[in-house]
Amino acid sequence: MDAVSWAPGRPSHPDTPPNIYEGGLGAQQQQGPSAQGSKPKNFRLRHLRSLALYLPGHMQPAGQCGSHWLGRLMAGGSLTRPEGSPWPLDLPQGTLGPGNSHCSALLEAHLPRDSLGNTASSSSMDPAKGVPSQSGPPEGLGLRPKRSWRALEETMCPLCKRTRSGALERT
């Protein structure tokens, strides 16, 4: 009560808070888009970008490295050209260096399976390979990619994390 009655008593004190609230808000609204808004926007973008770099590696390995890495690898690499399997293996080797040995071995083990499963289930190869096997084991086709996807996720995620951290460290 004392502070409340004392604040309005002073001419400068009640003058300052309204100024802060009204003037501050007004200034933010007016200058927001041009000067003041650009900085927080930049910061937010930066935060989101860094979070986007961080999250996929840790929280959604299937989402980011699955769709981006494996999608490119499978769709562009193994399906279109048969040389696809050595090409993606070369890439991690170049990026990783010493850590590639077990990763590439795992990739070699799972890549042929996955490329086979993908070619069988892909629409382009469906008329050739998929039609005869579709009527037989549809579950087998569904299981194979699932298995190899899981294995590839496990192999790729350390890769993604390592390459990401490497890229972050370089920058």
UniProtKB/Swiss-Prot annotation:
InterPro entries: DUF4644. Residues 1-41, 114-147 are annotated as: Disordered. Residues 116-125 have a biased composition (Polar residues). Residues 27-38 have a biased composition (Low complexity). PANTHER family: RGD1561796. This is Uncharacterized protein C16orf90 homolog.
